[in-house]
């Protein structure tokens, strides 16, 4: 007859298996109460800014240490922004207004090419930035910014340059919202909003990053797709040829009609409305949409772009696209939008479980 006694090894294995089983059940129970939310879109559309806003509105926000830690990024963004203008100036075969500015340009370009973290500006750097920014030729280059890739918050930082140059400078929340740090890989944050836990994923939008998205597509409750509508006359950074909004529309069509998201709520943020409205003063959207015959009226142009996105929905009989026109740096407006999105997602979940 076989022995009914357990060996010490088998008892230990049973204990380990029991611990693993309990953890799996706990993870499954935790997942039931969570809402999985993806932030998707092309590079520099504002995904990370939206996540920062959610953190400000519904989590711990940013501590003084958090703000101090991004000071170097602010300095770097300014230097890189001015360097981008100088390189574009050369591309357009422009010459700086005075020979004295050439030394300033070389100083800024050498800092931009350095692999070191940006430090507080020494007087030489601060004065060079100010002189170059106010040079008519640099401003002439800036007016042609749709023809090359540059950070769209540079004007904000240049307007705040004297404050940023202060010896005891600590970035503000507004500074934090406007810094540019490309998202590499996946940033995940769990935040409780209105009694419901949301597991939010922000993934890099550059082409090279999108292959990392697929493992996140399972069991998604809602997708927020963000498109920067001011980019209708700008080229993609990755190849310098593809129109940025055309790329965004193409990506939205793929995401919206993916089998992974047929049951998920599809939310569309037409972002950077402030920059879009400003651009309409000098440029028509028919530079991209040749069939558009309307005026440069802001509301009319937004409605047309919204239609171009929403008509791509192949499941319109069973799936609605919830569209919001946003400015990601406007905390008050984003609070209203996020509250609306959260109410909608929670309501859908309650209806899906028969609890409403």
Curated annotation (Swiss-Prot):
For region G3 motif, the annotated ranges are 198-207
Identify the residues that bind GTP: 41-48, 177-183, 202-206, 271-274, 328
Task: Identify where the record puts lipid attachment of type N-myristoyl glycine.
Answer: 2
- GO BP, one annotated term: adenylate cyclase-modulating G protein-coupled receptor signaling pathway
Please, where does S-palmitoyl cysteine lipid attachment map on the chain?
5
What InterPro entries does this protein map onto? Gprotein_alpha_su, GproteinA_insert, P-loop_NTPase
Provide the binding site for Mg(2+). 48, 183
Q: Name one Pfam family in it.
A: G-alpha
Q: Where is this region: G2 motif?
A: 175-183
Region listing for G5 motif, in residue ranges? 326-331
**Keyword DNA repair attached:** no
Q: Where is the G-alpha domain?
A: 33-356
Decide whether keyword rRNA-binding is in the record: no
Q: List every stretch annotated G1 motif.
A: 36-49
Kindly list the GO CC terms recorded for this protein. cytoplasm; heterotrimeric G-protein complex; non-motile cilium
Renumbered residue ranges of the record's region G4 motif: 267-274
Q: Which UniProt keywords apply?
A: GTP-binding, Lipoprotein, Magnesium, Metal-binding, Myristate, Nucleotide-binding, Palmitate, Transducer
GO MF, one term, reads:
metal ion binding
The record describes its quaternary structure and partners as:
G proteins are composed of 3 units; alpha, beta and gamma. The alpha chain contains the guanine nucleotide binding site.
Annotated function: Guanine nucleotide-binding proteins (G proteins) are involved as modulators or transducers in various transmembrane signaling systems.
Similarity field: Belongs to the G-alpha family.
Q: Which PANTHER family match?
A: GTP-BINDING PROTEIN ALPHA SUBUNIT (PTHR10218), GUANINE NUCLEOTIDE-BINDING PROTEIN ALPHA-15 SUBUNIT (PTHR10218:SF323)
Protein name as annotated: Guanine nucleotide-binding protein alpha-15 subunit
- Identify the gene encoding this protein: gpa-15
């Amino acid at each position: 007859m076989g022995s009914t006694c357990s060996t010490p090894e088998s008892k230990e294995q049973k204990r380990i298996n029991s611990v693993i089983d309990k953890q799996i059940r706990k993870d499954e129970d935790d997942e039931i109460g969570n809402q999985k939310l993806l932030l998707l879109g092309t590079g520099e559309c504002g995904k990370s800014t939206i996540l920062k806003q959610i953190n400000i509105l519904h989590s711990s926000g940013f501590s003084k240490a958090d703000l101090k830690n991004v000071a170097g990024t602010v300095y770097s963004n300014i230097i890189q922004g001015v360097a981008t203008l100088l390189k574009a100036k050369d591309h357009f075969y422009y010459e700086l207004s005075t020979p004295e500015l050439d030394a300033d340009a070389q100083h800024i370009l050498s800092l931009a090419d350095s692999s070191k973290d940006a430090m507080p500006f020494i007087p030489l750097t601060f004065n060079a930035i100010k002189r170059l920014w106010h040079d008519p030729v640099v401003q002439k280059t800036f007016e042609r910014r749709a023809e090359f890739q540059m950070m769209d918050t540079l004007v904000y930082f240049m307007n705040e340059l004297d404050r940023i140059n202060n010896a005891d400078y600590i970035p503000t929340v507004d500074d934090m919202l406007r810094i540019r740090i490309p998202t590499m890989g996946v940033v995940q944050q769990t935040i409780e909003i209105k009694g419901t836990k949301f597991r939010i994923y922000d993934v890099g939008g550059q082409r090279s990053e999108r292959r990392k998205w697929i493992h996140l597509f399972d069991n998604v409750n809602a997708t927020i797709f963000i498109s920067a509508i001011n980019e209708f006359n700008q080229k993609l950074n990755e190849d310098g040829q593809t129109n940025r909004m055309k790329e965004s529309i193409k990506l939205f069509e793929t995401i919206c009609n993916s089998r992974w998201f047929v049951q998920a709520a599809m939310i569309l943020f037409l972002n950077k409305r402030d920059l879009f409205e400003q651009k309409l003063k000098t440029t028509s959207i028919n530079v991209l949409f040749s069939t558009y015959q309307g005026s440069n009226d802001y509301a009319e142009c937004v409605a047309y772009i919204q239609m171009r996105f929403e008509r791509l929905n192949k499941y319109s009989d069973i799936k609605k696209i919830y569209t919001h026109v946003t400015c990601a740096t406007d905390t008050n407006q984003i609070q209203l939008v996020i509250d609306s999105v959260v109410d909608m997602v929670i309501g859908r979940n309650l209806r899906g479980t028969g609890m409403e």
